[in-house]
Every structure is written in C-alpha cells, then in structure tokens.
Amino acid sequence: MPITSKYTDEQVETILTEIGAVLDKHGATPELSLMIAGNIATNVLNQQVAASQRKLIAEKFAQALISSLQEPKTH
C-alpha cells in the first residue's frame, strides 16, 4: 500500500502468506476474505488507535487501498 514503510517487504510478505494459508485452509471465498480483512482493520482501529484519530486513519487506509488496485488493461 504505502510506497515507503518502516517494515521490510519480507516482514509483510511473511505475514500475508501465513494469513493467506489460514484463509485457504478454511476455504474462504473472496467475499469472506474481504469481510475478515475489514473486521481486522476495524478491530485494530477501535482497539489500538485513539478515538480522535480513527476516522482520519480509516480514510487514509481507504485511499491507500483504492490507489493500490490494479486498473483493468484496455486495448
């Protein structure tokens, strides 16, 4: 998502691979996977971010998510 990060690509990819394996193990559909990802984001914001900062961080997260989507190729 962000261009620069204090986390290494290896750290992110390792965690992503492990989470993906759990979703695969449970046969999670894309819809269920996205629902779980959304619930994780909501829980992190509600439990680990000051109430005064939640909306701003959620908006930045949403913008980063949208900007990371691949546009379909047109011919």
Swiss-Prot record:
UniProt cross-references to HAMAP family, sorted A to Z? UPF0352 (MF_00816)
Which family, according to the similarity comment?
Belongs to the UPF0352 family.
Name of this protein: UPF0352 protein VV1_3121
